[in-house]
Amino acid sequence: MVTAEDIGKRVEDDSGRVGILRDVIPDYEDPSELPWRRRKQPIAFLWPEQGGREWLVPPGNVKPSLLSP
């Protein structure tokens, strides 16, 4: 699991994707959900090292990467 202390570091999600941890929000609500369907949940924001689309993962499914850059 990652925490705010890991922001800016290389991490890997449980599917094997490697990226840079941008943020961890403990009470994130997805704005794309209808207001009455939103629920607070912890979310980690990961960004591909070479650029691209950021992806969201529960912080419990992310760990520091052991792969060299």
Roles of regions detected by a PLM:
Residues I43-P69:
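Intrinsically disordered, low-complexity, charged/polar segments
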Residues G16, Q41:
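Short coil/loop residues immediately preceding or within conserved phosphate-binding loops
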Residues M1, I20-D23, W55-G60:
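Short amphipathic beta-strand/extended segments with alternating polar/hydrophobic composition
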Residues Y28-R38:
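Short, solvent-exposed secondary-structure boundary/capping segments
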Residues M1-R10:
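Mixed-charge, Lys/Arg-rich low-complexity intrinsically disordered regions
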Residues G8, R39, G60-V62:
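Generic cytosolic/nucleocytoplasmic N-terminal low-complexity/intrinsically disordered segments
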Residues R17-E29:
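Short beta-strand-centered aromatic/proline hotspots
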